Amino acid sequence: MTHQSDLIAEDIHAYLARHETKDLLRFITCGSVDDGKSTLIGRLLHDSRLIFEDQLAAIERDSQKHNTTDEAVDLALLVDGLQAEREQGITIDVAYRYFSTDTRKFIIADCPGHEQYTRNMATGASTADLAIILIDARYGVQTQTRRHSFIASLLGIRHVIVAVNKMDLLEFDQAVFERIRQDYLTFAKALDIHDIRFVPLSALRGDNVVSPSERMPWYDGPSLMQLLDSIRLDADQALQAFRLPVQYVNRPNLDFRGFCGTIAAGVIRPGDQVTVLPSGRQSRVRAIVTTDGELPVAATGQAVTLTLEDEIDISRGDMIVRHGEPLPLVADRLTVELVWMHDAPLQTGRAYWVKLAGKWLPGRVTAVHHRVNVNTMEREAASSLALNEIAEVTLEIDAPMAVDAYRQCRATGSLILVDRISNATLGAGMIRSAEPSAGIQSEKDAARRWQAFEIEFNELVRRHFPHWQARDMRDWPGHKE
């Protein structure tokens, strides 16, 4: 089952070649405080024989000082690396770990369970394909269980494994497991998650983590590791149309001009006709360039450089799509599910930086439609947002950009709000829908709302540097008072 490292010592090149062809699964572990998330990851790594001898020796030494269990070795210390985490016996930051089996590679994000660190959990979930929701068998479904399940659903995670942990403390009682299973399924009816699996286990003792447990004969399903190894991800990509957000324009000399980025969705080949958004200009792909040479085809997840047949204006943040396929929306008014991540509350009407893929634009939240109570799934009236709160809002940006719905494509349907002074990340948004404002013709003459200091600076430039021939910003097309 688990990946053996003997090949690394014998033939590193053969190991790397085999490793590159494996499927990659990113998953998170989340749940309430002290449900055993870090212990579970430690057990996965330990029982998979993926801990080096020096790591195990270090954990044995640290266990004498920071042990939170009755065992000689506290496996949670493999993941809880911050001093504050070890002293308090909790997870604060998102900890990433890597391992593999014979068929699949894994990236684990161990997310904090405390409510004040929910923003950290949202960060870990933003790139995950699967979520392991841990539930303490003694307490059942808790508030944080609901909160994390809702965030996982909100962030588009399509697969959930509910791991009922600490079954050893309840004598591996089947009735307890079945009750928790039913409670969670009842709650999950309100969530957009269609693949939910359940497994009873003991992370501390190792039951049903890597190998099936002999102490739960009533459970005939796969172990947690077997589930992780077998879940299919090939149907998760909802969008098949080509999307390439431009991250960088590569111009090393006069003879080469390439547009670099990671393909967010779809497939591209030399000769394909493409459209650049939001400008709408068209051309054909001349070549797909990588560090390994030119490719005959490129697909989702590959970092490539496209060269085009025509010299057209393309900048960082523009999107290249394939002609004839469904197009993204080019809009400056978005309906967004927003997770607020800052101590200072959201202020409607205040200007923030909006970052989507490689694009940075000023924008503002103009309305809060409702706040979501993650415990009851009910919508509540709200005019602002506090730390860790989630709401549906209207976000207006100062120029149109090409976007997709988050459910269709994560990379082109997600954004963050950034403070324009401190550059602190304030919130994470998932685009639900988009609509263009009236009068938009192109990005350059899109409606703008100039700030007072920008207009004042423009006046100073025109007064003291008339030879620069600067135009009055208030006369620019689309200016709004």
Swiss-Prot record:
Q: Relate the assembly described in the record.
A: Heterodimer composed of CysD, the smaller subunit, and CysN.
Q: Which PROSITE patterns match?
A: G_TR_1 (PS00301), G_TR_2 (PS51722)
| Name listed for the protein in its UniProt record | Sulfate adenylyltransferase subunit 1
> What pathway, per the record?
Sulfur metabolism; hydrogen sulfide biosynthesis; sulfite from sulfate: step 1/3
To which species is this protein native?
Laribacter hongkongensis (strain HLHK9)
- GO MF annotation, one: GTP binding
Q: Which CDD domains match?
A: CysN_ATPS, CysN_NodQ_II, CysN_NoDQ_III
Reaction catalysed by this chain? Answer: sulfate + ATP + H(+) = adenosine 5'-phosphosulfate + diphosphate
The UniProt gene name for this protein comes to cysN
Task: Using the UniProt annotation, give all residue ranges assigned to the region (G5).
Answer: 202-204
At which positions is GTP bound?
Answer: 31-38, 110-114, 165-168
Where do the tr-type G domain residues begin and end? 22-236
Task: Give the family from UniProt.
Answer: Belongs to the TRAFAC class translation factor GTPase superfamily. Classic translation factor GTPase family. CysN/NodQ subfamily.
For this UniProt record, the keywords arranged alphabetically read as follows: ATP-binding, GTP-binding, Nucleotide-binding, Nucleotidyltransferase, Transferase
